[in-house]
Amino acid sequence: MYYFITFRTYGTWLHGDERGSVDRAHNQVGTELLAPDANLERYRRQLMKSPPVHLDGERRACVESTLREVATHRGWAIHALNVLSNHVHVVVETDETPENAKPEKALNDFKAWATRRLRESGSLSNAAEVWEHHGSTRYLKTEEAVASACHYVLNCQDE
């Protein structure tokens, strides 16, 4: 199975953000994003348990090497990977069949091991929240979908 997985660092893109955001009512392709709302963003910021996490060059390299290590250990193939300052995109091929597909396993493994390695490096404290809850896990069911996701990950990212 091929998946397009995205996950964000903690506190860097809250509901209400001027860029728009996704929630349960605004999470389908083609639907409007959650509208910017300064009051909602301020409220979400007040609920934060730790400061926002930004990935500098050293942290980005740590996350990238860790995701590649996890994929190798699991027997997965990474087809595209981009670690940015506030989120991670990865197109990964697992050994799952459609009947037992669980993209959340890949998402959770990537986040857990990246967190562990960042903490081991001394880059983040043990108390810091590192990633936002969950993330995006999209099934890629055709070669065209895989190619499109890889193109997006590798060629369509701004810092």
Regions found by a protein language model. Give the residues of each.
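Short catalytic/metal-binding and nucleic-acid-binding patches
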Residues: 1-159
